[in-house]
Each structure stands twice: as C-alpha cells, then as structure tokens.
Amino acid sequence: MFNDLLSELTKNILEHGGKKLIVPNEFCECVSKQGNCKLNSWLWDVPGFRRWRVTRLDAGDRLQVLNSVAYPNEQNDMPIMGIDLLWFEKKQKLVAILDFQPLVQDKEYLDRYFDGLKSLKKSFNEFNSDMKSNIYDPTKYFSPWALFCKGGNFEAENILPKIFSSFLKCYWKNLDLSKANENHIKSQEVSILHIDYDKYSAEKDPAHGLFSGFFGKEWSEKYMKEFLFPLSLENINS
C-alpha cells in the first residue's frame, strides 16, 4: 500500500526540478530490532521550497504509512503542504489527511490559496469528514478544507489515488499563483511562522509514540527533532 503514491509524488518532485539530498544513514533507513518494521526517509531540494521531506514506514499488515511535508522558501508565503496516510491492513482501515497548512487564518490569505482545496473537498465526499482531534488545535496550521478520510479498502483503492493526484496538481498551481502575486506575509514573518510550525508539530505530533514503539524512544526523539521538525530546535526570537 502507498508505493504507487510514493512513486507519483517522487515523479512530481522530479518533474519540478527536485534533486535528492543526502539523508544521514540513521534516518535514511531504519529497521526495528524485531525486524518487523522498516522506515525510509528522503529529503529533496526543490526550486521554490526551503525543505521537502518524505517518510515511508512499512510494518507489513500491521501498518503502512506515507508522510510528506513541503515548506516553501521564506520569500513565499504559500501554505505548507502536508500529507499523512495510514493503512491498517488487518483492520482494513484507512486514515488520510491531505492539507494546505495555512501560515495564518485571515480571510485574504485563505481566499488567495484555497480555492483548489475547497473544490476538492466538495468533489470527494469520502474526504469530507470533519477532523476532530484531542491532540491538535484545528484552527492552528490546519485549513477549514483539510481533506480527511476514515475509510476502508474501497476508499484506499479507488478514491485515494484520484484525490492524491488532484491534490498535488492544486498545490503546484498554488506555487505558480504565489509567483504571480505579491506576498501577503513578509519573508521574515514567514521564517518565524515556519519555526513555530515545527515547534508546535514536534510537541503535538502523535508519530513520536508510533516511532518509539518500533525504534525506541531515543531514536524517535532524535528523528522528530533532527529530521521531521528541525526548526523546533531554533530560537524563535533569534
């Protein structure tokens, strides 16, 4: 599960001039001590982006994960792209979130960047669920039009591939849109908001518990802070 989507994402990145960056060996591939789970990580240098990372976790029929986050460069105030897909084979359960994660929640910013996502949410009822969370504040770094699905094999096999392709196309359109318009947020503020995003995510992301169960707490903390959310180590006032 998700290998075809990973290939599509990789193809998209390459078509937009992406080049692979070196990932430290300890993060590039990690296998659990029990040998029942493998994690692979990729980091991309993509024109227009400060950082683009991808994670693929394969725990067999227990769990499959595809996660990707793309941070535009500081001169671009467009939303951060977030993809988080989980498949539980034994339970035949899909949990999927795809979102353009807004740096701010004001109307002018949302009107500029979210027409495409609004349209997708209307077009795919299966991904029109309300995202309720005891972990995240849905008004902080999530859009009102986040594509969220709790489904089964039908959604995983038939709906997810379609919405995944459309989602990526919409995000690339946002990149073109951002180049044609003056930023709504100044670059210095964009940098600060990216740091805040990483700090918030490093604290809230439930993946830490998941990784700890497979790879141990020490490795997981290092992976969270050094690979997934490295700006969480920055001083936001510096």
Curated annotation (Swiss-Prot):
One of its GO terms (molecular function) is 15,16-dihydrobiliverdin:ferredoxin oxidoreductase activity. It is an enzyme of class 1 (oxidoreductase). This is 15,16-dihydrobiliverdin:ferredoxin oxidoreductase. Keywords: Oxidoreductase. Its EC number is 1.3.7.2. Belongs to the HY2 family. It catalyses: 15,16-dihydrobiliverdin + oxidized 2[4Fe-4S]-[ferredoxin] = biliverdin IXalpha + reduced 2[4Fe-4S]-[ferredoxin] + 2 H(+). Catalyzes the two-electron reduction of biliverdin IX-alpha at the C15 methine bridge. It comes from the Bacteria. It holds the Pfam family Fe_bilin_red.
